[in-house]
Amino acid sequence: MSRTLYMVIEHYKNGDATPVYRRCRDHGRLAPEGLSYISSWVDTKFERCYQLMETDNPRLLDEWIAHWQDIVDFEVHSVITSAEAEKRISPRL
């Protein structure tokens, strides 16, 4: 099974990043084995985070989200790289 990239958009509940950073500091990312963190970007208002994750088992995302859903609302989108998108669309050009 191939690994899939996921763009996870985290919306901090009540626009408050403090509990999220506190939990991450105290307990780490809480990602199950098989779910890999790639990188993340946080908006300058500390209201949301754009996080790139990778796994071959999308159920692991649900397991990970369960650790955070009390303080974060999630959007999860499967994504591909720009290079892969170009490769896939080129036959239609």
Where are the language model's segments positioned?
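Conserved short beta-strand edge segments in small beta-sheet-based binding/regulatory domains
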Residues: 71-82
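Extracellular/luminal beta-rich ligand-recognition
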Residues: 51
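Short S/T/G/P-rich N-terminal loop/turn motif that feeds into the first structured element of a domain
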Residues: 1-38, 42-48, 56-60, 81-93
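Short, flexible helix/strand-to-coil boundary loops that buttress conserved ligand/catalytic motifs
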Residues: 65
